[in-house]
C-alpha cells in the first residue's frame, strides 16, 4: 500500500464503507466501479461528494471505496461518513468545518424491531369494538 494513504470507516443503517484517500485528480471508485456507474440516483452521488465539496478537495484527492450491506441510501450515507473520517485523518484542521456541517456524527437511526403481538414495529392489529 502507498505510504500517503488515509483510511476511514463509515456506517449508516446496515451499511458499512471502507474509504481510502490518496492525493490524485478527483477520481472516485466504489466497489471497482465509477461513482456515476455505482449510484444511479443523482441524490446519492451528491451525498457522497458533500464532505469533499465542503473542504474544497474534490479535484485533489482520489478515493477508493468498498461498501457492503443495506440499500442505496444507507450505502451513500456510510460512504459520506467514511470520507469524513478519512479527511480528518488526512488533515485534523478540517474537523471543525466537517463537525459544523454535521458529517462527523454517526447517524444512529436504524430500523426499529418488530414486536410480538403487533403487525410491524408499531402498527397494531385492527381493533374491533364488537
From Swiss-Prot:
The keyword Nucleotide-binding does not apply. This is Small ribosomal subunit protein uS9. Keywords: Ribonucleoprotein, Ribosomal protein. InterPro entries: Ribosomal_Su5_D2-typ_SF, Ribosomal_uS9, Ribosomal_uS9_bac/plastid, Ribosomal_uS9_CS, Ribsml_uS5_D2-typ_fold_subgr. SUPFAM superfamilies: Ribosomal protein S5 domain 2-like (SSF54211). Pfam families: Ribosomal_S9. The keyword Ribonucleoprotein applies. One of its GO terms (cellular component) is cytosolic small ribosomal subunit. One of its GO terms (biological process) is translation. One of its GO terms (molecular function) is structural constituent of ribosome. The lineage of its organism: Bacteria, Pseudomonadati, Pseudomonadota, Gammaproteobacteria, Vibrionales. Belongs to the universal ribosomal protein uS9 family. It comes from Vibrio parahaemolyticus serotype O3:K6 (strain RIMD 2210633).
Amino acid at each position: 500500500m502507498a505510504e500517503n494513504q488515509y483510511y476511514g470507516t463509515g456506517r449508516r443503517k446496515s451499511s458499512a464503507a471502507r474509504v481510502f484517500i490518496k492525493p490524485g485528480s478527483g477520481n472516485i471508485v466504489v466497489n471497482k466501479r465509477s461513482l456515476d456507474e455505482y449510484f444511479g440516483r443523482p441524490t446519492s452521488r451528491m451525498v457522497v461528494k458533500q464532505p469533499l465539496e465542503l473542504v474544497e478537495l474534490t479535484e485533489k484527492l482520489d478515493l477508493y471505496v468498498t461498501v457492503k450491506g443495506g440499500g442505496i441510501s444507507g450505502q451513500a450515507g456510510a460512504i459520506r461518513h467514511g470520507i469524513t473520517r478519512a479527511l480528518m485523518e488526512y488533515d485534523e484542521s478540517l474537523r471543525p468545518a466537517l463537525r459544523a456541517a454535521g458529517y462527523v456524527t454517526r447517524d444512529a437511526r436504524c430500523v426499529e424491531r418488530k414486536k410480538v403481538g403487533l403487525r410491524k414495529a408499531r402498527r397494531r392489529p385492527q381493533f374491533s369494538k364488537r
